[in-house]
Amino acid sequence: MSSRSPKDLIKSKWGSRPSSSKSDTALEKFKGEIAAFKTSLDEITNGKGKVANKDRSKLLEKIQVLEAEREKNVYYLMEKDKEIQRLKDHLRSRYSSSSLLEQLEEKTKECEKKQQLLESLSRETDILKKQLSATTKRLSELESKASTLHLSQSVPANCFNSSMNSIHEKEMQLKDALEKNQQWLVYDQQREAYVKGLLAKIFELEKRTETAAASLPQQMKKTESEGYLQEEKQKYDHLLENAKKDLEVERQTVTQLRLELDEFRRKYEETQKEVEDLNQLLSSQRKADIQHLEEDKHKTEKIQKLREESSVFKGKLEEERKKSEELLSQVRILYDSLLKHQEEQSRVALLERQMQACTLDFENEKLDRQNMQHQLYVILKELRKAKSQITQLESLKQLHGFTFTEQPFPLQGEPENRVKATSPKSPTAVLNESLVECPKCSVQYPATEHRDLLVHVEYCMK
């Protein structure tokens, strides 16, 4: 067997372990960061904090690093599979030992298991990436709604549901991390057992080599050809040197694997510490959620109390509104009655003014009547005088004749003219010619019908 074969076989089985261990460590750290990110997301949901864009960019960088490392591990694993297949073909062509083929088959199966584990880790990475994208999307939605979000009745229930969901998710992540750690412990135990078995097989191969080296002189004696013996000796010496080199390589590999095991144990302890920190964080988060729920309960009770007070105030306000409406209707009625009263007062004042005007007109008419009666008395008196003068003149005319009538005419010219002016009409006719009219409707009445005029004025002023 060549000097590379055991080393390549060991590397084909354990070569991708450091990168897988690193990827698993990065994945665990990534899970812790996602848990912290979800914790901060729950704090944002409860109004306790905000996640900066810097943390989000860090998480995205972590995802990219994990993706690159996963692709690198997949490529490395494919190369190892090709190397295993090549070694398998080489061993089949050189050796017909069934034990080596069985070992190679076992190593191939273990490599397949390792590949399946790597695929499961890659799937888990994809799932975590999807969860992170969904969480980022939800965070952006929450940040967009955070500026317009107000306290309402559904806020306590939503906060409670979101906090319970976040607690459940954290518990599931914690259980998943514990299961993964347990799987890695079992895997490390199996790897250690495999290394021990491999060392035992290496020692057995050394013994076989030594036995073959011890039996070589006897075989050399039995052989007839010196050239064949020399060739076989060189062959076995070469195999012995290769076996020693492979043994040294395997010892170095075992030392390296032990160092990796110690490193993995250290990382496992760190993971356990992170799990404890997560438990403490979860307990503190639960306490904070309980406190927040109590605060929400107090707020709900306060809101209910304020609503009851608001309903009482609304009832009082409705009663006051009804009273104000009643008072307003009464005020309107009083205002209408006041307007009617003012109208009545204005009508009364108008009637009083009209009565005063009528009274004044009546007094004026009374004065006019008195003046007319006085004038009538004067006219009648003058008429009597004129009649007496006419009678005297007629008697004188009859007595003295026509010769004496010419002398008194110039002396009695003015009374004669007056008699001529008044003789065609009687005093009653002169009185009837003076007219008196109503002050309101201007209806004219003769002065002799002054009583009818008074009756008309009283009727017209009503």
UniProtKB/Swiss-Prot annotation:
<feature type="region of interest" description="Required for localization to the interphase centrosome and to the midbody during cytokinesis">
    <location>
        <begin position="354"/>
        <end position="462"/>
    </location>
</feature>
<comment type="subunit">
    <text>Homodimer. Interacts (phosphorylated on Ser-423 and Ser-426) with PLK1; the interaction is indirect via the MTMR3:MTMR4 heterooligomer, occurs during early mitosis, regulates the phosphorylation of CEP55 by PLK1 and its recruitment to the midbody where it can mediate cell abscission. Interacts with AKAP9/CG-NAP; the interaction occurs in interphase and is lost upon mitotic entry. Interacts with PCNT/Kendrin; the interaction occurs in interphase and is lost upon mitotic entry.</text>
</comment>
<feature type="modified residue" description="Phosphoserine; by PLK1">
    <location>
        <position position="434"/>
    </location>
</feature>
<dbReference type="GO" id="GO:0051896">
    <property type="term" value="P:regulation of phosphatidylinositol 3-kinase/protein kinase B signal transduction"/>
</dbReference>
<dbReference type="GO" id="GO:0090543">
    <property type="term" value="C:Flemming body"/>
</dbReference>
<feature type="coiled-coil region">
    <location>
        <begin position="50"/>
        <end position="185"/>
    </location>
</feature>
<feature type="coiled-coil region">
    <location>
        <begin position="228"/>
        <end position="400"/>
    </location>
</feature>
<feature type="region of interest" description="Interaction with TSG101">
    <location>
        <begin position="157"/>
        <end position="235"/>
    </location>
</feature>
<dbReference type="InterPro" id="IPR022008">
    <property type="entry name" value="EABR"/>
</dbReference>
<feature type="compositionally biased region" description="Low complexity">
    <location>
        <begin position="12"/>
        <end position="23"/>
    </location>
</feature>
<dbReference type="GO" id="GO:0032154">
    <property type="term" value="C:cleavage furrow"/>
</dbReference>
<feature type="region of interest" description="Interaction with PDCD6IP">
    <location>
        <begin position="160"/>
        <end position="214"/>
    </location>
</feature>
<dbReference type="GO" id="GO:0042802">
    <property type="term" value="F:identical protein binding"/>
</dbReference>
<feature type="modified residue" description="Phosphothreonine">
    <location>
        <position position="428"/>
    </location>
</feature>
<dbReference type="GO" id="GO:0061952">
    <property type="term" value="P:midbody abscission"/>
</dbReference>
<keyword id="KW-0132">Cell division</keyword>
<keyword id="KW-0498">Mitosis</keyword>
<dbReference type="GO" id="GO:0005813">
    <property type="term" value="C:centrosome"/>
</dbReference>
<dbReference type="GO" id="GO:0030496">
    <property type="term" value="C:midbody"/>
</dbReference>
<dbReference type="InterPro" id="IPR038926">
    <property type="entry name" value="CEP55"/>
</dbReference>
<protein>
    <recommendedName>
        <fullName>Centrosomal protein of 55 kDa</fullName>
    </recommendedName>
</protein>
<keyword id="KW-0963">Cytoplasm</keyword>
<dbReference type="Pfam" id="PF12180">
    <property type="entry name" value="EABR"/>
</dbReference>
<dbReference type="GO" id="GO:0045171">
    <property type="term" value="C:intercellular bridge"/>
</dbReference>
<feature type="modified residue" description="Phosphoserine">
    <location>
        <position position="426"/>
    </location>
</feature>
<dbReference type="GO" id="GO:0000281">
    <property type="term" value="P:mitotic cytokinesis"/>
</dbReference>
<feature type="modified residue" description="Phosphoserine">
    <location>
        <position position="96"/>
    </location>
</feature>
<dbReference type="GO" id="GO:0045184">
    <property type="term" value="P:establishment of protein localization"/>
</dbReference>
<dbReference type="GO" id="GO:0005737">
    <property type="term" value="C:cytoplasm"/>
</dbReference>
<keyword id="KW-0597">Phosphoprotein</keyword>
<keyword id="KW-0131">Cell cycle</keyword>
<dbReference type="GO" id="GO:1904888">
    <property type="term" value="P:cranial skeletal system development"/>
</dbReference>
<feature type="modified residue" description="Phosphoserine">
    <location>
        <position position="99"/>
    </location>
</feature>
<keyword id="KW-0206">Cytoskeleton</keyword>
<feature type="region of interest" description="Disordered">
    <location>
        <begin position="1"/>
        <end position="25"/>
    </location>
</feature>
<feature type="compositionally biased region" description="Basic and acidic residues">
    <location>
        <begin position="1"/>
        <end position="11"/>
    </location>
</feature>
<comment type="function">
    <text>Plays a role in mitotic exit and cytokinesis. Recruits PDCD6IP and TSG101 to midbody during cytokinesis. Required for successful completion of cytokinesis. Not required for microtubule nucleation. Plays a role in the development of the brain and kidney.</text>
</comment>
<feature type="modified residue" description="Phosphoserine">
    <location>
        <position position="423"/>
    </location>
</feature>
<dbReference type="GO" id="GO:0005814">
    <property type="term" value="C:centriole"/>
</dbReference>
<keyword id="KW-0175">Coiled coil</keyword>
